[in-house]
A protein has these predicted regions:
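Helix-loop-helix connectors at the membrane interface of multi-pass transporters/channels
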Residues: 3, 86-97, 118-138, 170-173, ...
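Hydrophobic transmembrane alpha-helices that form the core helical bundles
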Residues: 44, 57, 66-150, 155, ...
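TM-loop-TM module centered on a large, flexible mid-protein loop between adjacent transmembrane helices
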Residues: 87-95, 127, 243-309, 326-372
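Membrane-interface loop-to-helix entry segments
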Residues: 122, 135-190, 221, 244-248, ...
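C-terminal membrane-solvent junction of multi-pass transporters and transport-like membrane proteins
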Residues: 162-163, 329-340, 380-433, 463-468
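A generic transmembrane alpha-helix motif of multi-pass inner-membrane proteins
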Residues: 177, 181-182, 363-367, 371-379, ...
Length: 468
């Protein structure tokens, strides 16, 4: 760019409407990361790295998440857009190829995440109604959530607000119940709380913490949904700076306290069998019906995560259509201001969750979350890189300084921290169970998307020139 860039238009283009409010964004951000990755996925780290390793892994992942939020907040305050980092990659990456690639990778990852969350919800519902197969529950939940998202962004926001409120309340209740349980055990038994396992801090070696970070980081991924929602939020320049730091600190607090309780009372030697460690704690806390209540909370968490997945993936596809990286039909909206065809194609591909008819639900779920975790790391790397390039562009005068409505602290170290740590987590995947297979599958996806870019580049370039 040769000329000084001024502030972007206040209203979104393409038919989307700014009808999400501050309370939607607050609860969406907070509840969006409290999902199946925490309630169910935590069983694997507890088993593989022990209580101390699990606590360290989640605190470290939370720090990465907070740094990413700060970088994304700076970009979203300057350029509120429902395409979030995919659109920012088009602005700040040297080639549009990466914007195209990360956009499609991220969309596919949300589709798989949607399938994982549907699988988790279906698996839980199946426990209450064993006569109904898991895949039938998956289909029913998908149809209901698709109908909600087709109505309006406000309908999505209201649904997500109350589902997230349930999760937040449950976490607070769990921390209180766990605290009482620890206190009673200390006073009436020979048990003493410790984070050690057989006298060791890390029973399988500290390097296992790096290996399990793919599953751990998945628990926090979804917080970047704030960037997508910024394009449909009232007064994003005012709201976002107020929520970013507070949301990040609250998430770390909730995760830290909840996992500390789990690390102290949950037997790490238990083999993950599909039951949430949270349910195990409640069932041993002596509260009548608490384990059943927690199971229902986890069900709502899975439904909430699936709801967010439909929203995020459809907005990403809408953004790519606007950038001429996807068919134009995905950019069309209905009277409620939602991208109809983007939502429908997302729901259609999420029917992969019906494979639970042939694959055990727990095994299928773990495979899906490990796969999506890698793309999430790439997305966070993109956010860090774009924020770094944006701040450099402001310094050299390419962009006006008044765009810095929110400044990410400790520049450039925050962005560098985000990039380096996420890259290290991706490397660690190679040493995890089935890590090589997961990486090869994702590499095949990336190569396929890159090949499609070079195959369709002449057509895409003509479309972009015509629109521009």
């Amino acid at each position: 760019m040769d000329t000084l860039q001024q502030s972007p238009p206040a209203e979104p283009e393409g038919g989307l409407r700014r009808n999400l409010k501050k309370r939607h964004l607050l609860m969406m951000s907070l509840g969006g990361t409290i999902g199946t990755g925490l309630f169910i996925g935590i069983a694997e780290p507890l088993s593989s790295v022990g209580p101390a390793g699990t606590l360290l892994a989640y605190l470290f992942a939370g720090t990465i998440m907070l740094a990413t939020m700060m970088c994304l907040g700076e970009l979203s305050c300057a350029f509120p857009h429902s395409g979030s980092f995919q659109h920012y990659a088009l602005m700040f990456m040297p080639s549009p190829c990466w914007s195209y690639t990360i956009g499609w990778l991220y969309w596919f990852s949300w589709v798989f995440s949607l399938a994982a969350d549907l699988t988790a919800a279906g698996f839980i519902a199946h426990q209450f109604f064993p006569a109904v197969p898991v895949y039938m529950f998956c289909l029913a939940i998908l149809l209901i959530l698709t109908a909600i998202n087709l109505t309006s962004a406000k309908s999505f926001g209201e649904c997500e607000y109350w589902l997230s409120a349930i999760k937040v309340f449950a976490i607070v209740l769990f921390i209180c119940a766990g605290g009482v349980m620890i206190y009673s055990l200390m006073g009436h038994s020979d048990w003493h709380p410790t984070l050690k396992t057989d006298g060791m801090w890390f029973p399988h070696g500290w390097e296992q913490i790096v290996v399990c970070m793919t599953i751990v980081i998945y628990s926090f991924q979804g917080v970047e949904l704030v960037g997508n929602a910024a394009g449909e939020t009232e007064s994003p320049h005012i709201i976002l700076p107020k929520v970013i730091l507070g949301i990040g600190l609250r998430i770390i607090l909730f995760y830290g306290l909840a996992i500390a309780v789990l690390a102290l009372v949950y037997p790490h030697e238990l083999t993950p069998n599909g039951q949430s460690p949270f349910v195990w704690v409640f069932s041993h806390a002596g509260i009548p019906g608490a384990d059943t209540l927690m199971t229902l909370v986890i069900f709502s968490a899975a439904v909430s995560a699936a709801n967010s997945a439909i929203y995020a993936s459809s907005r990403m596809l809408w953004s790519m259509a606007g950038d001429c990286f996807a068919p134009a039909c995905f950019g069309k909206t209905n009277g409620g201001g939602v991208p109809v065809y983007a939502i429908l194609i997302t729901a259609l591909l999420a029917l992969v969750s019906l494979l639970t008819r042939y694959i055990p639900a727990q095994q299928f779920y773990l495979y899906l979350i490990a796969s999506t975790g890698q793309v999430g790391c790439l997305a966070w790397i993109t956010i860090g890189w774009c924020q770094y390039r944006f701040r450099q562009s402001v310094r050299n005068g390419t962009y006006a300084s008044d765009l810095l409505r929110y400044r990410s602290p400790l520049f450039p170290w925050t962005a560098r921290f985000v990039i380096i740590t996420n890259f290290a987590i991706m490397v660690g995947t190679w040493f995890s169970k089935q890590g090589v297979v997961i990486m090869l599958v994702e590499l095949a996806f990336m190569i396929g998307i890159l090949l499609s870019w070079y195959l369709f580049r002449p057509t895409l370039s003509r479309l972009r020139n015509t629109v521009g």
